[in-house]
Amino acid sequence: MTIPAVQASGLTKLFDQKIAVDHLDLVVQEGEFFGFLGPNGAGKSTTIKMLVGLLRPTAGTALIGGVDIWTKPLAAKGMIGVLPEGQTLYERLTGREFITFAGVMYGLSEAEAAKRTEELLGLLALDDAAEKLIIDYSQGMRKKTALAAAMIHAPRVLFLDEPFEGVDAISGRAIRDVLQRLRQRGTTIFFSSHILEVVERLCTRVGVIANGRLVAEGTIPELRERAHAGEASTLEEIFLRAVGATHQDGTPEDERTLSWLA
């Protein structure tokens, strides 16, 4: 039996007795480009933080390549790269220094880390800014720098939480191109985003979370069929039905309006 790249079993998180993630079961196989969707506050970022070992679950387990992220953290974390939401970078380092530092921290030799850093700087169009301090970087440059640091060690699984948030079209295209290359080499990508067109274009399978529970999972054709949506239905239409924002006929569940715009 093939060992899944990512597996969550009964994953639960409570904050002051409020359920943020509710007994979530999820399996992502090797080489999948998995899109993880949900409304604001649905539990996406909380789930990702538990899967990568940044937030301890109240209950349940999270496995990376069959290794428990909490009982064997070094072994599990060595297999992953993480681009978290609201990433924090060392702003007094240059982009080149930060990416190289990340490579060494993941166990690469200084020479190998430096070599890979130069390749990543070129691939992500960061060459001209490589000697600038990160404190002077734009949002898009910071995202690309964080992505480079997350993938410098060629992780088995790459977790991306809102990688396109606040990113311009040029930086967005560079990031998409890199993700496509990673997918082609067999990297498993766990990808959370509110930009559904990008998810629809890139992902091989999608999961939808609402109120801390996984409410839909499958390929886009499978989700269309389960939602009784037509073949031309977009992922946005499928998503809105899955989270209960629209009725089966596509009309809004909540039709409240502003009285002064009526």
Where do the model's predicted regions map?
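Conserved catalytic motifs of ABC-family nucleotide-binding domains
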Residues: A154
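Conserved ABC transporter NBD signature motif
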Residues: G60-T71, A75-A76
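ABC ATPase "signature
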Residues: E217-G218
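Helical segment within the ABC ATPase nucleotide-binding domain
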Residues: R173-R185
